[in-house]
Amino acid sequence: MAAQGFLLIATFLLVLMVLARPLGSGLARLINDIPLPGTTGVERVLFSALGVSDREMNWKQYLSAILGLNILGLAVLFFMLLGQHYLPLNPQQLPGLSWDLALNTAVSFVTNTNWQSYSGETTLSYFSQMAGLTVQNFLSAASGIAVIFALIRAFTRQSMNTLGNAWVDLLRITLWVLTPVALLIALFFIQQGALQNFLPYQAVTTIEGAQQLLPMGPVASQEAIKMLGTNGGGFFNANSSHPFENPTVLTNFVQMLAIFLIPTALCFAFGEVAGDRRQGRMLLWAMSVIFVICVGVVMWAEVQGNPHLLALGADSSINMEGKESRFGVLVSSLFAVVTTAASCGAVIAMHDSFTALGGMVPMWLMQIGEVVFGGVGSGLYGMMLFVLLAVFIAGLMIGRTPEYLGKKIDVREMKLTALAILVTPTLVLMGAALAMMTDAGRSAMLNPGPHGFSEVLYAVSSAANNNGSAFAGLSANSPFWNCLLALCMFVGRFGVIIPVMAIAGSLVSKKSQPASSGTLPTHGPLFVGLLIGTVLLVGALTFIPALALGPVAEYLS
């Protein structure tokens, strides 16, 4: 079993790196504002038709464009969901959503979280899924990538005050990165058996003679960008464990690759744009080390079996509860770590049914800020915050002003870095405390004791860090939970983007200093270890007390 697990991890990472390397080169061209071959004429026509100016923006203008687009998208999606019953492509005549569920869903998809307090096949029409959720899957992913484009330019430009043009970046990312890759993935899913139609739900007779209503819909097109954009919201309630979304082991492997593809490519792109590919490889090494360790822990925990079933005398040599038999324990464990290391949240197994330690690792990966590969764009700019913190700590130890890529990291950057890093832990801990203090929060818990608290902590961690997966034992479709999680998702997304853009605005105006004998190398194994230690230290100090009350207490009980 151990050999199979290591082979699975190694194969996954090898294929991932092979695919991400050329995509990283294409992204590097876009960061450097070099159009991809053959796209200049199309861009010129589109910019002219849309009235888009390619004039560069400072950080405030760039941020305003990103915020404006997302707030407008939130409003449009909110009213679309409220009035769903008036719109076309609703063969099941599904009613509009309640205001609190519509708000939660709109915020969820605009912030790239895709938390779902509803069942897709019984709640949303085809129009809402396509024109509402799928559109936001593209736009939220493009927004995250645009932010990291701006931050990378801030590190590599000198003595400037502009970071590019947000509208140009968003258009190029959507047209030349997300759309073509998502199209290829969608066609592969269709070939493998995923649904793509507009038929009414089909009544069929099962082999047992019973009647069953099978949901239909344009699944493959949404599934592709759901994974590629690290969105994660399923067309169906069962998400990627549903055979209409994820029909074969091949589609399952491609889905995992799609989740990590752009985050990995962005690391390669960062190294190219910085003029030192070792910088990108350093980030990949740090992410990969944490990732492999976490996968190993989850696999080990799940193959030990369920101790509660063993105590009852039941056969539980491995923990298959809540897992698809066609995927098994090892693949389910790998997928769980992939989807929570990235801010995806798609699932092929019920995380609520994992063992105490097996469920704690995905929760902790979210709590450290989704920086182990992370979401498209958001994972890398989150990790860059820890890079700045690690450089600052190293500077304190050797008594020098911290530098990164030749740019001095001053008090302003460190204050903004600390603010950005503290946003999501504050939301998680305060949100979980509020839920446990109120009847409205506690009434949603299916289980008592440590596992019930773990359900609450997981939900708030998932929302604040824009992941979207859940311990499904929490009944979250209530005004209290819909509003609390919507607030966590919105602040968790834009409360980090705002200081990140402010950091970019500060760094882009600085001039790079040549390296000296006292400059800390940021591309070697020493800095990789320092960076990993910084991530672990912040995660440990912040969340160990809360984790001790939940999964650790459950494991020891």
UniProtKB/Swiss-Prot annotation:
GO cellular component: plasma membrane
Bilayer disposition of the protein: Multi-pass membrane protein
Main location: membrane
Compartments it resides in: Cell inner membrane
Keywords from the UniProt entry: Cell inner membrane, Cell membrane, Ion transport, Membrane, Potassium, Potassium transport, Transmembrane, Transmembrane helix, Transport
A GO MF term: potassium ion binding
Matching InterPro entries: KdpA
Origin: domain of life: Bacteria
Segments crossing the lipid bilayer: 5-25, 63-83, 132-152, 170-190, 253-273, 283-303, 329-349, 356-376, 379-399, 416-436, 484-504, 526-546
Similarity field: Belongs to the KdpA family.
Subunit: The system is composed of three essential subunits: KdpA, KdpB and KdpC.
Summary of the function given for this chain in its UniProt record: Part of the high-affinity ATP-driven potassium transport (or Kdp) system, which catalyzes the hydrolysis of ATP coupled with the electrogenic transport of potassium into the cytoplasm. This subunit binds the periplasmic potassium ions and delivers the ions to the membrane domain of KdpB through an intramembrane tunnel.
Protein name: Potassium-transporting ATPase potassium-binding subunit
Lineage: Bacteria, Pseudomonadati, Pseudomonadota, Gammaproteobacteria, Enterobacterales
